[in-house]
């Protein structure tokens, strides 16, 4: 391949690499959260902290290093994940306790708590792009009720069924 051809294909190659790298981002979602936890899930200290569930709906693992959770549209890089892997199909609970714990070997805690009256909540990629959000804010929350995405079910009728 001559030099001119290589130069012409370079932008296409860069575009393909960028698109491939962006694919896992679409697989991460905030699937559920609880902004007023009294009698629900407890953290490692036995406290009923608010929590956020992140789901990797894809097949490939995603390294969370450089990803962020935020409750502020003005500060998209509010709380950064440590270098941790979330496998394809896996769920990860992060406590929104204000304790700011990022040890990948232990439970994760954001440096903010969730507001039961409703607020902005987002998952942000290492590139600073919002991947999933509750915007402009999620609705007022009831104590001990989680909020999030519903589980989708597809029903296919059986051939010959009535």
What are these regions (language model features)?
Residues 9-19:
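Bacterial N-terminal signal peptides
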Residues 1-6:
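N-terminal secretory signal peptides that target proteins for export/translocation
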Residues 155-162:
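A flexible loop/linker signature enriched in serine peptidases of the S9 family
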Residues 23-154:
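Activation on beta-sandwich/Ig-like modules and their edge loops
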């Amino acid at each position: 391949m001559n030099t001119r051809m290589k130069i012409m294909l370079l932008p296409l190659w860069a575009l393909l690499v960028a698109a491939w790298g962006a694919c896992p981002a679409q697989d991460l979602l905030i699937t559920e959260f609880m902004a007023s936890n009294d009698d629900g899930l407890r953290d490692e200290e036995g406290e009923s902290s608010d929590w956020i569930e992140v789901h990797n709906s894809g097949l490939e693992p995603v390294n969370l290093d450089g990803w962020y959770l935020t409750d502020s549209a003005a500060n998209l890089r509010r709380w950064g994940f440590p270098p941790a892997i979330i496998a394809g199909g896996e769920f990860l609970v992060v406590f929104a306790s204000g304790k700011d714990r990022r040890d990948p070997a232990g439970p994760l805690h954001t440096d903010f708590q969730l507001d039961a009256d409703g607020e902005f909540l987002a998952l942000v990629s290492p590139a600073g792009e919002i991947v999933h959000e509750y915007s402009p804010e999620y609705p007022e929350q009831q104590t001990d009720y989680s909020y999030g995405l519903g589980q989708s079910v597809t029903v296919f009728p059986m051939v010959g069924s009535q």
